Amino acid sequence: EGVCLHVFMWNDRKNKYIKLKNRLVPQLELYNYLKYKLDKLADMIDIENYPHTGSANAGPCQKRLSAISLDDKWIGHFLDYAGDERILVKAGRFGKRLSTQTFEQVLYEAIMESLGYKNNKEQFKHLGTIASINDIKRLIPSDVSIQERSRKIQALLFGMSGLLPSQISRYKSAKDKYSHEYINDVEQIWSVIKNDIVNKPMGGELWSFKYSRPGNYPTRRIAAISRLLAENFETGIFRVILKSFDQRDNSKSGIEGTKAIIKNTESIFLELYDEYWSNYYIFGGRRLKNRERLIGKERSSVIFINIIVPVLLAYARKMNDTVLEERLFKAYKMHSRLSPNNIT
């Protein structure tokens, strides 16, 4: 009786009204008003901001999930029975991308997007496509130190993002000698690399520094992914993370072994430091009193749950790897619930 408007995606019957108890209710078809195709809109939904399971907002499957023994025989079917549609949807999307992309590229783009937080997700996602893993492998030498490799990747990603000082008209001159030396170095590297790049760099004005803690600025996040790529250059991020799930300590109990998987995987992100960006928030900014890691505990947890678990789930199902699927289930179920404030 309280219906005043009937809203749906497609109007199959083409009627402008429906009749309810002797009164006409107007209908609204949404399809003609969509700005993008449904597949693109689905990818744009920020699932990470959906409520996480908890006593105040748990869904109908949470009670059943909490009562499940980790040793139940159906555990290999993973989240089909666990009831977390959020993870399944993400795994499905990553699975679709795998039809045209490598596992390494899919994971790289997903991590990039996760580093973008609310205001820079699309920017980071685009950066991951115009400066792909193949581009990085092609342009960055492998026979150099991790630090030098990281700096070259930084030059590439900063240049393609449009965030280098030479690309920003309102850039203020560096305040100290070390910043001058660093900036000159990455600018010089970029001046050479850019000649071998086909894709057009982004505009620096597209990036948002508002409403973010300085430690979460795009510049710091680009430095973080650069270091991550540099440290795992030969093997690749995907294989390194996959290996952390394969190397469970058999001497430990099931619970302790799963905890070790979580700890070892998150440590890949928690132990990222850079000679420059662990001491600065922006190009030429004021030097920090204490060195800071590039990715904190909170963000590494978000990446573990929202990126690593669904990407590896897509991989496990593609490869029919029930052992990996079981380990993913156990790690997912054991992982402490993410903070309600996990998105900045």
Model feature map: region roles:
Residues C4:
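Short hydrophobic-acidic sequence motifs that mark active-site Asp/Glu residues
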